[in-house]
Amino acid sequence: MEEFQVYLELDRSRQHDFLYPLIFREYIYALAYDHGLNSSILVQNXGYDNKSSLLIVKRLITRMYQQNHLIISANDSNKNPFWGYNKNLYSQIISEGLAVSVEIPFSLQLISSLEKAEIIKSYNLRSIHSIFPFFEEKFPYLNYVSDVQIPYPIHLEILIQSLRYWVKDASSFHLLRLFLYEYCNWNSLITPKKRISTFSKRNPXFXLXLYNFYVCEYXSIFLFLRNKSSYLRLTSSGVLFERIYFYAKIXHFVKVFDKDFLSTLWFFKDPFIHYVRYQGKSILASKNTPFLMKKWKYYLIHLWQCHFFVWSQPGKIHINQLSEHSFYFLGYFSNVRINPSVVRSQMLEKSFIMENLMKKLDTIIPIIPLIRSLAKAKFCNILGHPISKPVWADSSDFDIIDRFLQICRNLSHYYNGSSKKKSLYRIKYILRLSCIKTLARKHKSTVRVFLKRLGSELLEEFFTEEEDIFSLIFSRASSTLQKLYRGRIWYLDIFDFHQ
């Protein structure tokens, strides 16, 4: 990215109005495909001349604007090499260029907002593990929680419309609509899910960019009303980007309640509402009665229906007590556990017993989904019994051990924040025995004979527990400090979580 920094220094006052010319710049596609400026930007494809990369993009966009090419039959597309064999390839080229172009102003705004807030170590805030210390601090004092799955729009036109209030470039929106109608035939009111899924797989960066704009629009509206509806100002987080024409956009939503906007917000007064989101899932938690949680629930439903025209079933949003139910978020089952403690006190000649209740957040590893994932990857069966990995048997011993080691380290790195480590030890045992069976299969031997010949200490150095590493580092430290490092450990270098 550093070699392209000179191209990203746009004029701050004009950055919204000049996105369209960026689509015709070579370095945009070099950024999209992570290639050098002088290298080819297209993947290898039979029958394609990769010497005319940007020229073909320009010709393709020009033809899209010609009226006689807006409607092309299937027979013509088979004859024309521009729209025939390489149609999916050209679709991916333009979508990647569009995705990078619309992300540039947001990146500059994000950098500017972090500089104004004097946030130097902003990379620590990006770690998804930074959410769990917030859970540990706030959730033991809350009563109700609701996990909300943000619904996906039924039409990509809704995603494009959300961009109008973030970028003031009419030419870019016109090209976006023309691109979708030209390549994907988005000419029906309701787009089949299969077509959206196929388009998302072929153009992941473009679909993800549109979805992020939709989620950002939803979150900005929600946080705006969260701040306005609370007696206390929100200090722990804020909206990074400026809202545009917000009051005009909510006019249709206000008519639903048939009341004044301020009187509507009066029912949502809740200074103890907490909101956390990652990708398409969000968590709402509150200290007050479930009545206010239901108000927020139906507010979100009406917001999706009236503002984004997305249908959401109220029955899919559940409101549960934290002390009785667990919620699934970022690969953990979390709940609030009550630890009773009895203290005996004596005053003069009288003694009495005091019972104290301590609330603590528990984070538990979902062992059954993890075993299913390992079984799907052929590391074990559905019951959790380790099996060999025959696909890796052709590799060298070092490569086999290194592959298993990398998976084991990643799981240990992510799930070291669990309150109960027994499930993590079971996952490590499955991977360890699967590695041994794979090595024994390669050498055409049994596990017992293989371990007897090479020794059971063969894999000890590859599967060293992180707790043992900490105990070696702090061998001379106090026992309290050693217990601290044997507990939950959250890392600030985990930026992504794959479901």
Swiss-Prot record:
Entry's localization field: Plastid, Chloroplast
GO biological process, alphabetically ordered: mRNA processing; RNA splicing; tRNA processing
Described purpose of this protein according to its UniProt entry: Usually encoded in the trnK tRNA gene intron. Probably assists in splicing its own and other chloroplast group II introns.
Family membership: Belongs to the intron maturase 2 family. MatK subfamily.
GO MF annotation terms: RNA binding
Pfam family for this entry, one: MatK_N
Keywords on record: Chloroplast, mRNA processing, Plastid, RNA-binding, tRNA processing
Name by which UniProt lists this protein: Maturase K
Any one annotated GO CC term: chloroplast
InterPro entries found in the cross-reference section: Domain_X, Maturase_MatK, Maturase_MatK_N
